[in-house]
Amino acid sequence: MEVKIMTNQSTIDKLIEMRLTAMADAFRIQMDDPTMKEVPFEDRFGMLVDIEYSNRKNNRLKRLIRQAEFEQPDASIAAIDYQSGRKLNKALISRLATCEYITEYRNIFITGATGSGKTYMACAFGMEACKHYYTVRYVRCLLYTSPSPRDRQKSRM
């Protein structure tokens, strides 16, 4: 019995060393659960792999969202308000939410009046791209459209 405990602990240590921490935690839980002894090895192993895989995907998504530096990280396509006065094309927004424009090497430019929800829309599209595991960087275009000092000097002449 003690040899088995040592072997299991050694296995857990190796999983942690290989950075399979979610799998190591799940393995500990499986070992402590008497009902798991009745589950076939292949099923138990599959559960461990699924847990590690899900954990890695979740961590990757969190990292992508954090690195995107969204102004509104809670933005969501599902929460967009399509009131008639806003003149939003729901079909177009749904199509853009699939992120096909990214595979086609296209960009999205969102224009509108102040307070119309441009930032929210941009963040919502960015969040959707993150959910498809694309790297996103949120940048305000104002930085790129303001005249340079050289342009201002030319306009004075």
Give the ranges of each region predicted by the language model.
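Walker A/P-loop nucleotide-binding motif
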Residues: N107-T119
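Walker A/P-loop
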Residues: T119-K131
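Phosphate-binding P-loop
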Residues: T98-Y105
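Short beta-strand-centered segment that lines the nucleotide-binding/catalytic pocket of NTP-utilizing
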Residues: Y134-L143
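N-terminal pre-Walker A segment at the start of P-loop NTPase domains
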Residues: A78-L96
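Conserved small/polar residues in nucleotide/adenosyl-binding loops
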Residues: Y144-D151
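Interdomain "pre-motor" coupling segment immediately N-terminal to P-loop NTPase/helicase cores
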Residues: D25-E71
